[in-house]
Amino acid sequence: MTITDLSGRWEVCLDESKADALPQKYPDRINLPDSTSNAGLGALNTEMEYGCLTDLHKFEGFAWFRREVEIRPEMSGKNLTLFLERTRKTRVYIDGNQIGEYCSLCTPHRYDLTGLPAGKHELIIRVDNTDYPTGGGHLTSRDTQTNWNGIVGRIELQSYSAYPEYVYAIPDPDKKTLHVRAWIKGAHCGTASLRVFDVTQEYGSAAAEFSDEKPLECDIKLSDSAPLWSDSDPAPLSLELDLDGDRCTVTTGLRRMSADDRTLLINGRQTFLRGKHDGLVFPQTGYMPTDVDSWLKFFETLGEYGINHVRYHTCCPPDAAFEAADILGIYLQPELPFWGTVPDEFGAEHKFLREEGWRMLREFGHHPSFVMMSMGNELWGSKERLNELIAGYKAEFPDKMYAGGSNNFQFVPCVLEQEDFFSGVRLGRDRLIRGSYAMCDAPQGHIQTERPNSVHSYDPLIDEAAALAGTQVIDENGEIMIQYGTEMKKVKAESWDNISVHVPVISHEVGQYAVFPDFDEIKDYTGPVRHEAYAAYKKGLEDAGMLHRWKDFFRASGALAVDCYRRDIEAAMRSSMMSGFQLLDIQDFPGQGVATVGILNAHMKSKGLVTPEEWRRYCAETVVLAELDRFVYSASDEIECGLLVSSTEPGFSAEKILWELSVDGTVVDSGASDIREQKGRIYRAQSVSFTISCDKPTEARLHVSVEGEAENEYTLYIYPNIDIEITENYISGGGKRIEITHDPETAKNGGALCIPTSDENSLPGEYCTDFWCYGMFKSISESMGKPVPTGTLGLLIDNKSELLKDFPCDTFTTPQWYEIVSHSRCADLDGTDIEPEVWVIDNPERRKRLGLLYRKDGAVCCTSRLWEIADRPEVKWFAYSLMEYLGK
């Protein structure tokens, strides 16, 4: 094949009116590949977006691109193809004559220009980013990569005698064979030579005939030395087809992803997906890159945080992403660009989607990293049509694992006959398989509702034969109110609470723990998009007199979010019946209300909240886990601790789990516990127990490890026994007593603690940080008639305050605050300049001044109802610290 690169200078005409006639003038210029917005073309967008990024040169309509191309004499008489790697709807003209039009949102556009005579010709490409045949999901959404217009990948003239338009290889790692199928263009019949190799050697070869009537098809037997491909040992192979001098090389690999009941296997051994959601968010350009180096950098960053899997939400990345994932060992799950209801009979939209799926499989299916595929996001409608769709793909491309969608049917999930894995958030109304949910999707998860612990497992919920029926979910008409995209809708429902799942279970969109924005990121938006929401939040915080605290809010909320993610991930790691999770997200999501839920910002840069090494302690191929039913203890408690390892590492052979308990850097107890039981990837050791003596509140560190493999650490909060009484009227102990009053005036002169009665402006205390983003789910809850989210982001604590002198703590939320927060209503201090000792961090959209412990007009005020939790050791010491200060 001879390639003529058409990248470079093109003339442009932008037409929002979408006139069908060829333009008379092309007033602008652009260097393709690029988008019109990134090139700064079109009018400046004066409409600022606050629920997503603002595209400074937003353009929707026809973009006409023109340039001269030359067909050299040696190209004349050969087959000639115009190749456009990634674009929108296109139409092509040569010398003023329409050649054709094409619509694929996920795959290259190819135009047959065979027969074009030698010489110079006018080439015009019209790109239309309106009226797509489907909604497009994250492929065309302003919430992710923007609805760009342009051509953002390779632009080429390809000339050849014969060439495979598509090449597909079905690997059989057991037999060490590749079954190759190729669709040949340009020759009526012939013989192709095939060989498989890598940089070190050739592993096999074959010859195969082809004709117009049938594709090329053959088996290539590989040598025993041919390596297998997996996440832990990626070994991509090159497959070359030689068609009488016209050569084509694609990447393939020997791998099989399969299932044994609920266990996910790679090449016959267990694997576990440590995944992230991805919507192709690249704010620097507003569209995804199409070069391998950019994707290597992207996946290498993910690998630093232990991620081995990416689920593409209603989108499909370009070939370069698969190529990079092949090299680094990342499991990819592209998805049809659809988010909605599947009809009983396919109309134009679903016929397009079906064909788009075929195009995705034929274009990218040879890549070993392409292991899974989903039919869309949160689908409703016809199970029969979904089954048929999967069955068709599976018959031709059997080496993929398929799901009817991600989190289909929501409250009433099912497993379709053709599905190879289940991706969802629940197996019934109360069978919850992730740690957090929006209020409109209640009941909420264990991270939101349980005292912090490290024992929660999803196994009883996955294995449960029957679940409690959600009597309040399905109405008398058999309908259910659900979140539908970013809005709400009623759909027909069936009762599937008793489903039994015997395919791998993948937890969908895990996390969504909000972090206060990092306003320093504003300066990073130097491309075609701006973060106007951040600017608005910053101005609003300044108007509220709290801008000086934003970095503190950011760090404190971030520390809590990291801990929430950790406990959610560890719950999945502990669950032997779980086969993986897909985080939403370690990367911020700049749309759908602006969801700052990442430990990385939208540019994939670290926020400085957690190091990769710290994150990999609980998100890696091998993770050591301690099981503790709580993290707060009395000094007299005997602490029971389970010890286990989750490992899918080939050759894992540890025999013991080592544990070490330290206080103030001094080891006070240690041991080695024999691994006695294995259940799949879970290796369980003998439990241990210990006590920690102390005469003052103490933090202890429990360090667990397996020699040479992995380590983890847990913080325990230990409180000595103290003789203190807490009632609704007083706190007393050690000969001291302070009164509790509900009137700040009474507490002005000291000697009394004000615990004010809640008013309509106070908010319920919540330990966990907000889910996703306040604005979006407040709107959805109101539309559904459901409770609105509280919307707070944890605590910011002045841990040097005299009020907390006898209650040592950090500056952010930790488990010792769980009971105190959960039994409080935070005070609304708007209109004051009070700087609380314990702030409750509000979300940046509402940005109220909220306090749990603060001073007002000389009175010390605490909004926690301490008498309700008077038996808790940490509460006794918190009350003691307040009493010591107020009793002076």
Language-model regions, residue ranges each:
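Short alpha-beta junction capping motif
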Residues: 730-776, 857, 862, 885
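Substrate-binding/catalytic cleft of secreted carbohydrate-active enzymes
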Residues: 309-600
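Active-site-adjacent substrate/metal-binding segments within catalytic domains
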Residues: 42-70, 78-81, 88-93, 100-103, ...
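Accessory beta-strand-rich segments of carbohydrate-active enzymes
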Residues: 4-18, 35, 55, 59-164, ...
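Catalytic beta-strand/loop cores that center a nucleophilic Ser/Cys/Thr
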Residues: 459-489, 778-873
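Extended acidic/polar, glycine-enriched regions
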Residues: 115-120, 183-260, 694-724
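Beta-strand-rich binding/interaction modules
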Residues: 92-94, 177-209, 216-218, 637-674, ...
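Aromatic-rich peripheral "rim/lid" segments of glycoside hydrolase catalytic domains that contact
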Residues: 396, 584-647, 657
